[in-house]
Amino acid sequence: MNPSTAQARVVVDELVRGGVHDVVLCPGSRNAPLAFALADADRAGRLRLHVRIDERTAGFLAIGLAVADRAPVCVAMTSGTAVANLGPAVVEANYARVPLIVLSANRPYELLGTGANQTFEQLGYFGNQVRANISLGLAPELSAGSPGDMTSLNAQWRSATCRVVVAATGSRSANAGPVQFDIPLREPLVPTFDDDGSCPPGRPDGKPWTHTPPVTFDQPLDIDLTPDTVVIAGHGAGVHPNLADLPTVAEPTAPPAANPLHPMALRLLRPKQVIMLGRPTLHRPVSALLADPSVPVYALTTGPRWPDVSGNSQATGTRAVTSGTPDPAWLRRCKEVNDHAVAAVREQLAAHPLTTGLHVAAAVADAVRPGDQLVLGASNPVRDAALVGFTPHGVQVRSNRGVAGIDGTVSTAIGAALAHDRTGGRTIALMGDLTFVHDSSGLLIGPTEPTPRNLTIVVSNDNGGGIFELLEQGDPRFSDVSSRVFGTPHDVDVGALCRAYHVDNRQIEVGQLADALDEPHEGMRVLEVKADRSSLRALHASIKAAL
C-alpha cells in the first residue's frame, strides 16, 4: 500500500467512526487517494457519497446535509482554487455553527513558493472563520520491513482526524463550526496494482480512536417575569419550556412559539424587558426594541457567543431561572395585538390586486404540514413567512441565517432534503428568482448520484430583487436608478433553465400552489409562480396603516 492510499483510508475510516454519514466530493487529481477511499466506503455502505463538479455548491450542499442530519459533513476537493471556492460556505458555517469539515488535498508543502502548478498557501486560507486549521502532514515512504512505522503513523493520523471531528462538532467547546483538514499527498495518487484494499486497524467495535464526550455548557441566569416581558427568539434559539407562556416573536428558524407575537405588533406594545434567545436576524422593529436603552435585555444562547448589536444586553446565560408571574393583563394585550396584526396582514393580502412574494409565502405557509421540512431563502421569503403569521409546529424550518447570503440556497435545500428523506417526509423550499438563479448550478446532480426523493422548490419570480422595493433604495425618488442597479431584472427563463438540468418544472398561479404542493410526486421539481414587485412598497404600507 502506498503512503497516500494508506493515509486516505485511515482518515476516511476514522471520519466514519466519528459520526460522518455524508461526504461531498469534488473531482480532482491531487485528492484522488481520498476519492478512492471515499468510493470504497460508499460501496460498503459506511457513508453516503455525493459527487459535485462545483466546490461552491458542494459546500452549501454539505451545509444542508449537516444542518438537517445534525451531524458533521465533509466536503473534499483538490488543491488550488478548488479550496478557495469554499469561502462563502465556510463563512456561513462559522456564524451558523455548522460542523462543516473542509477536507482539502494539497501538494507536498516543500513545493510552496516554487511555482508548482495548482499550488498556493491553502492551509490557513480561511483564517479565523474556522474553528481549527489542522494538517495531517506528508506521509513518509513506507517500508515493508518496518511495520512499526505504520503502527505509529496510524495512531497519529487517527488522532489528528479525531481532533478535526471534535473541533467541528464543538464537543469540547460547545461551539460547532467549520474546520479545515489539509492533507498533503505525495505521488503515487492511485492504489498499486497489488493493493488488497486493506486499512490499518482502528479501535475495536468501530469506536473512534479518541473518544470525547460532548461538553455541557450551562450558565443559569435569574430573571424576574413580573415586568411586562417579550421574548425574541432568533436563529439558533434553544428550547425554554419555562418561558413558553410569554409572548414570543419567533423567527421561522426558531422553535415554534406557544404564545406567538407578530413582529409588526411590537410597535403597539411597550414591554418593560426583553429575553433574547439565539440571534435575531430579521425584523427592524425587533432591532429597534433591542436597541432601546430603557428596556433591559437578557440574552440566552446555546453556546459561548451571544449577540448584542446595540450593546444593550444586561446579562447573558444559557437558561433562565425564573421568578415572579407575568401580569395576565399584559398577556391578554399581547394576544390581542398579535391577532390584530395577523388579521391585518391577511386582509391586506386579500385586498391587494396583484400577486406578490408575500402572497406566495402565505400560500406555502398554509400548505405545509407536520413532518415537512421547509427551507426558506435568506432574502424576502424568510421574512415573508414571519409576516404572514407562520408558526411551524411539527415543521423543521431551515434558512442560511449565519451571514444571510442568498448564495448556495438551492444546494442547501437539496442537502437538507437528502437528509430529511431518511424520515420519509417531504421538503419544500421557497426562494426568490435571484436566489434561484444565483445557485442554479446546484440543480446539477449526476445520474449516478443520490437525488432527493421528495423536494419541491417554489420559485417566487418577480424578475429581480424585490427586497430592495422595501428598503431605502426603493424610495420613488431613486426609481430612475434603483430598478436597474438594485432590482437587477434578468429575464431568465426558469423553465428552460430547469430543463437544461433535467429537473421537472411548471409555472402555476398562486391560487394553484396549495393543490400542486399536495400532489404526490417523486424526486425533485420546481414550481414557478410569477409575482409582482412594483407594488410591494404599497402593500407593506397598507399593512402598516391597517395596524
From Swiss-Prot:
InterPro entries: MenaQ_synth_MenD (IPR004433), THDP-binding (IPR029061), Thiamin_PyroP_enz_TPP-bd_dom (IPR012001). Its cofactor is Mg(2+); Mn(2+); thiamine diphosphate. It comes from the Bacteria. It holds the Pfam family TPP_enzyme_N. Coiled coil: none annotated. SUPFAM superfamilies: Thiamin diphosphate-binding fold (THDP-binding). It is an enzyme of class 2 (transferase). Catalyzes the thiamine diphosphate-dependent decarboxylation of 2-oxoglutarate and the subsequent addition of the resulting succinic semialdehyde-thiamine pyrophosphate anion to isochorismate to yield 2-succinyl-5-enolpyruvyl-6-hydroxy-3-cyclohexene-1-carboxylate (SEPHCHC). Homodimer. This is 2-succinyl-5-enolpyruvyl-6-hydroxy-3-cyclohexene-1-carboxylate synthase. The lineage of its organism: Bacteria, Bacillati, Actinomycetota, Actinomycetes, Mycobacteriales. The gene is menD.
